[in-house]
């Protein structure tokens, strides 16, 4: 059990993955994430460390490669934020997602809540013929 919460250096390490480098191991995730972690992003919601690790493994497996670059980290009390850029290579095409993660640290110092905020639709469907035009039209009508 950890006595101190996850540090900025720990988050820098967790949220940095160059192309061609392996993702963190299950033991690495378990060192920093609570067994009952809640994970939410624009595409899914998972409860528990094993479900979180499974979600990360599935992302890596369905991509040719993944990168994650950290830009800024802030921790105040039991809350942390990480600004990042994620790149996914799928069938030779690269998709870039800028985003932010909000983390809540539990009494044991581990991450008990992890929520990712990023635009899934624009970078995913924008480059696709026909879907890209529809996505941009929807954005122009309802978002921009």
Protein language model features and the residues they cover:
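Flexible interhelical turns and helix-capping residues at alpha-helix boundaries
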Residues: 19-22, 41, 92
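Intrinsically disordered, low-complexity regulatory regions of eukaryotic regulatory proteins
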Residues: 2, 39, 114-117
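Short acidic-aromatic low-complexity motifs
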Residues: 2-35
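Exposed alpha-helical structural elements
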Residues: 10, 28, 51, 130-134
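A generic structural signal for ordered secondary structure
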Residues: 7-18, 56, 68, 99-101
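Residue-level preference for long, well-ordered alpha-helices that form the structural scaffold
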Residues: 4-7, 48, 135
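A beta-strand edge to alpha-helix "cap/lid" segment located at domain peripheries
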Residues: 61-67, 74-144
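A solvent-exposed, acidic/Ser-Thr-rich amphipathic alpha-helical stretch
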Residues: 26-78
